[in-house]
Amino acid sequence: MDIFFQSKKLEKIASDPRKCLKELGQTRAELFQKRLRDLYRADTLEDVRYLPGRYHELSENRKGQWACDLDQPYRLIFEPHEDPIPTDENGKYVWIEIKGV
């Protein structure tokens, strides 16, 4: 899956293990790197749906965003790169058609 970052700072944290460890601490950095690896290895968002980390859609004011757990209470929040986000006839998001975040 293609991953794009909202800021250069976040991209640097994701690509530099030492900076990631310094910014996030050991436990959160390990989980952050693992979740990113899961996303990189996936072809679509559906591939990570049932992996550890509880990947899930958000609602209310965060509708159109997804999250996965890091260490409590932290989570990684991301948005699909597709615009508009693919939906079915019932208005539910089609995870298998999302190929970038």
Where in this protein do the model-derived segments appear?
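Residue-level signal for secondary-structure boundary elements
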Residues: 18, 22, 44-48, 70
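Arg/Lys-rich, positively charged N-terminal/basic patches that mediate binding to nucleic acids
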Residues: 1-37
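Generic alpha-helix structural propensity
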Residues: 31-34, 53, 69
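A short, surface-exposed loop/turn module that caps and links secondary-structure elements
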Residues: 43-66
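Enriched for short, Lys/Arg-rich terminal
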Residues: 68-101
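Short, surface-exposed charged micro-motifs
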Residues: 2, 57, 67, 77
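Pocket-edge structural micro-motifs
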Residues: 7, 59, 70
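Short, contiguous, well-ordered secondary-structure segments
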Residues: 38-42
